[in-house]
Amino acid sequence: MEHSVPKNKLKKLSEDSLTKQPEEVFDVLEKLGEGSYGSVFKAIHKESGQVVAIKQVPVESDLQEIIKEISIMQQCDSPYVVKYYGSYFKNTDLWIVMEYCGAGSVSDIIRLRNKTLTEDEIATVLKSTLKGLEYLHFMRKIHRDIKAGNILLNTEGHAKLADFGVAGQLTDTMAKRNTVIGTPFWMAPEVIQEIGYNCVADIWSLGITSIEMAEGKPPYADIHPMRAIFMIPTNPPPTFRKPEHWSDDFTDFVKKCLVKNPEQRATATQLLQHPFIVGAKPVSILRDLITEAMDMKAKRQQEQQRELEEDDENSEEEVEVDSHTMVKSGSESAGTMRATGTMSDGAQTMIEHGSTMLESNLGTMVINSDDEEEEEDLGSMRRNPTSQQIQRPSFMDYFDKQDSNKAQEGFNHNQQDPCLISKTAFPDNWKVPQDGDFDFLKNLDFEELQMRLTALDPMMEREIEELRQRYTAKRQPILDAMDAKKRRQQNF
């Protein structure tokens, strides 16, 4: 439910408001979840009574990215893009005050209801999203992280683009960008290949988001993201798992988004004229879906509150029994829901299951620094960078960092390199499932299944390490040859 009706609509924070402490201007009500670079809270603007969202970002976070997000939001004025009202510094945090979208993200709604969206609902969401993209692209901006998690709905059903933490600006002197930034499963092929890209990279991501809204997850979500990054540029464009369940118009819309050649990919303006979007129903059809999701959210919050109260009571009892020798652990963060799920073969029903790879790998991937780009922006910039030095693809650094983080968290609890684990843990004669064919598993006994499950992570690490070694073996001779040529040129 929204808060009280605003006394007058907040357009921008006044100079007077910006000189005060944020607590004097806002009442913070509750934590909504985690966004790029910070936590997001629901708050009320005391003077107008309007509900807003406040992103609190630790100053030690990547300040350049935060400033970029603020800069892009400041320049935007569209009903299809989340509005920016102002910002504050408070202790070690930067407070960014933004428009509040009461229904949350489309991915939140899917998770809360345990259902995917219908075609009519998807068309309505896509129409607003395309209008937001048309506006951004007209302003020469690329969002670069379009996905269901970054499409927010207000309580009336209007969709708005959010989370500009990785958005980029195109200038007249720079037709294409060359940084790999975004979320792996939603990335356009040209972004992964680092061959330069423009606004239509967002259109590919929108096509993937269309499948995500229809099926509950993007294509390749069940495989390791590193493999996905190699498969997206080489495989044909992904399609629905069961195309016969969807109309010709919807299938054709997704097909036009997922054209591998960016020169042949449709623009946001062109897609707004597509029959699937032209025939979209008004936002009022989303109200039942939003009401159901918000009711589910309120119910879950009540259940969490009850559990916390019960835990507190139990803790107090245990403390008394143990004569104050027990240390009470902190409660879980009540942030954005992280449950993941897979879709059943039936219509729109999601079956929740335990933690999967999808849960830990759908976060935004910000890989290359734009430092060099920003410096070049100040002077003249070449249309197509032609540096003679061939650099290691930047997405490899991302996986190095992921592996490093896993090691720090005690991921290698066996205290040995998973790549060096004896092959007896996973014999070479084990059958590897192809294209999701897992029928042979039914014939295995429980112990063999358990053994396979235990060996899966080390097996994955070994395969990745072998892939890395093959890559290095191919790359090093090229670098050596280049160095030799450079030395000859210098001697010349």
Curated annotation (Swiss-Prot):
Residues 297-307 have a biased composition (Basic and acidic residues). It catalyses: L-seryl-[protein] + ATP = O-phospho-L-seryl-[protein] + ADP + H(+); L-threonyl-[protein] + ATP = O-phospho-L-threonyl-[protein] + ADP + H(+). The active site is at D145. It holds the Pfam family Mst1_SARAH. Keywords: Apoptosis, ATP-binding, Coiled coil, Cytoplasm, Kinase, Magnesium, Metal-binding, Nucleotide-binding, Nucleus, Phosphoprotein, Serine/threonine-protein kinase, Transferase. Disulfide bonds: none annotated. SMART domains: S_TKc. One of its GO terms (cellular component) is nucleus. Residues 308-320 have a biased composition (Acidic residues). Residues 297-339 are annotated as: Disordered. The modification Phosphothreonine is found at T179. Residues 326-339 have a biased composition (Polar residues). The record marks D322, S323 as: Cleavage. One of its GO terms (biological process) is regulation of MAPK cascade. It is found in: Cytoplasm; Nucleus. Belongs to the protein kinase superfamily. STE Ser/Thr protein kinase family. STE20 subfamily. Homodimer; mediated via the coiled-coil region. This is Serine/threonine-protein kinase 3. It comes from Danio rerio (Zebrafish). The gene is stk3.
